Amino acid sequence: MCPWRAGSRDLRAALIHPHAFMTAATSSALPVLILHTGDPDDTLKSQFGGYAEQIMQAAGLTPSAVDIVAVYEGQRPQAPSSYRAALITGSPAMVSDKEPWSEDTAAWLREALEAGLPMFGVCYGHQLLAHAFGGKVGYNPAGREVGTQTVELLPTAGGDQLMAGVPTTFPAQMLHAQTVLQLPAGAAVLARSDLDEHQMIRIGRNVFSTQFHPEFGPDFIRAHLERYGRRYAAENLDVPGLSANVRATPVAAGLLRRFLETYAPGA
């Protein structure tokens, strides 16, 4: 694992000039790393697959094209040079708990940024990237964000290669209680929602993350709301209204494929 700190000179340089450490010439024959940080409950997993499987499918990848590393079970990835990109899944865990496996993964992410590896984090992965590079993560003061919600692009997304042609507003699936409260130095916010000012961020040139879930389909969200509706109702969430509003999110769903096609195309 990488021994250096989030505030080091090397990290600041990587945030500003990631191309100085690695070009886009990461071999197209290398696998995509999926950093698996947790799973849904057994019932949802049996119906829809685990989070690593869902993110693999949403990215248009096959099992032979990925290396799934269950970091939450103590597995560790190889060196960043072994991969053409890394995707970081969601998780029921909380980044603010700073579990040892999570902190070890954060150290690997700092090493990967220095190496110039393209990365895309989702939900827990979004928060872990921010935490790894000096941001602050905690419970969202606006409360839990669940269901299909509207994401709004900010002007900073206008010149971004990944977001070219993306509508200024689009629906996305949400499922989170914690959020990025404070950005890492040098990070750019690309999108927001009514309850979260940091729905999508970019770090350096080729590291992206979303609080929303590109990999979740409407059936998964409906099933989740059905299973956890009582808990959410106790938090004064309008569960029937949330369920009725669930719908397909094709723009959000396409972001993982767009990311790989743009920054880490395969053979």
Model-derived segments and spans:
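N-terminal beta1-alpha1 cap of cysteine-dependent amidohydrolase-like domains
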Residues: 3-4, 10-11, 15-107, 111-115, ...
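Hydrophobic/aromatic beta-strand patches that form the interior of the parallel beta-sheet core
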Residues: 33-35, 67-69, 87, 120, ...
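Short glycine-/acidic-enriched loop or helix-start segments at secondary-structure transitions
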Residues: 44-45, 78, 97-98, 130-132, ...
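Short, glycine/charged-enriched secondary-structure capping and boundary segments
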Residues: 47-50, 81-83, 100-103, 134-137, ...
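Structured helix-beta-strand junction loops
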Residues: 62, 108, 115-116, 169, ...
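Cysteine-nucleophile active-site neighborhood
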Residues: 89-160
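Pocket-forming structural segment of enzyme catalytic cores
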Residues: 133-219
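C-terminal and late-domain segments of enzyme folds
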Residues: 188-190, 196-202, 206-267
